[in-house]
Swiss-Prot record:
Keywords: ATP-binding, Ligase, Nucleotide-binding, Protein biosynthesis. Its EC number is 6.3.5.-. Pfam families: GatC. Belongs to the GatC family. One of its GO terms (molecular function) is asparaginyl-tRNA synthase (glutamine-hydrolyzing) activity. SUPFAM superfamilies: Glu-tRNAGln amidotransferase C subunit (SSF141000). This is Glutamyl-tRNA(Gln) amidotransferase subunit C. The keyword Transferase does not apply. InterPro entries: Asp/Glu-ADT_sf_sub_c, GatC. Coiled coil: none annotated. It comes from the Bacteria. Gene3D superfamilies: Glu-tRNAGln amidotransferase C subunit, N-terminal domain (1.10.20.60).
């Protein structure tokens, strides 16, 4: 699957990143090769092969999911430089509100 320079530029703009034309072309080529390799892997016959999630022989240890009392909201907001009705206000980072 060919990734175009326009697609790379579009995603870069959404991420607020800027690349030169040479970098954009290189990313498009590299990403196209990666997608092609993933598509090729999808064609491999894995019939009879057990699913593998890790090569390490370890078990995940999880703590019990127990609800605990949180920090008192008023106490927490004493350290907040700017707030509005218990919402923490932070500086805007998107010029026009973004595409999100």
């Amino acid at each position: 699957m060919k990734i175009t320079q326009e697609e790379v530029t579009h995603v870069a703009n959404l991420s607020k990143l800027r690349f030169s034309e040479e970098e954009t072309a290189a990313f498009a080529t590299t990403l196209s090769k990666i997608v092609d390799m993933v598509e090729l892997l999808g064609e491999v016959d894995t019939t009879g092969v057990a699913p593998t999630t890790t090569m390490a022989d370890r078990k995940t240890v999880l703590r019990p999911d127990v609800a605990e009392e949180g920090t008192d909201r008023d106490r927490l907001f004493k350290n907040v430089p700017e707030q509005d009705n218990y919402y923490i206000k932070v500086p805007a980072i998107l010029d026009d509100g973004g595409d999100a």
